[in-house]
């Protein structure tokens, strides 16, 4: 039972993703239903802080890649469910993920033009959002950039 597992946790960081090679059914089960189940469990267990990895521009249908439409649909609606959940959320929408060492420099928000970000830098960003009040109840794109993670998050508009 998920609620029992997370009882007593300070926060949930949801990073699960179906990957690019699963069908629409797995995408919906993992990226949408899995996210919603953890949101529901968080509320039942009294865990108020919830951070989720989404997808770059998941909030902008006009920018969705046609070949990845089921993925974007799942991320979009998971984001919307989280925003309406009453939880203290942060939605992090990374650009294209790359398997390179972290550089610990990012660009966030409207200034984050389509680009890539290392998986390690996404992880560092997620940890930095945990207690950064400027990220509470916010959703933003993130790519590798010029500012330190702390500076970028503190300056998020």
Describe these PLM feature segments:
Residues 2, 9, 44-49, 56-157:
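Oxidoreductase cofactor-interface core, primarily capturing Rossmann-like NAD(P)-dependent enzymes
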Residues 1-37, 41-44, 59, 130-131:
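NAD(P)H-binding glycine-rich loop region in Rossmannoid oxidoreductase-like domains
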Residues 16-18, 54, 96:
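Short, small-residue-rich loop/turn micro-motifs
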């Amino acid at each position: 039972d998920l609620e029992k597992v997370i009882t007593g946790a300070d926060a949930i960081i949801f990073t699960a993703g179906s990957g690019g090679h699963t069908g629409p059914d797995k995408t919906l089960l993992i990226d949408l239903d899995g996210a919603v189940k953890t949101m529901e469990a968080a509320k039942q267990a009294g865990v108020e802080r919830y951070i989720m990895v989404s997808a770059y521009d998941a909030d902008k249908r006009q920018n969705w890649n046609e070949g990845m439409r089921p993925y974007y649909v799942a991320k979009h609606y998971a984001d919307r469910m989280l925003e309406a959940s009453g939880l203290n959320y942060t939605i992090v929408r990374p650009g294209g993920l790359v398997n390179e060492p972290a550089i610990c420099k990012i660009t966030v928000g409207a200034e984050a033009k389509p680009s890539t970000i290392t998986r390690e830098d996404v992880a560092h960003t997620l940890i930095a959002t945990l207690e950064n009040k400027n990220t509470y109840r916010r959703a933003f794109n993130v790519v590798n950039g010029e500012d330190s993670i702390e500076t970028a998050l503190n300056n998020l508009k």
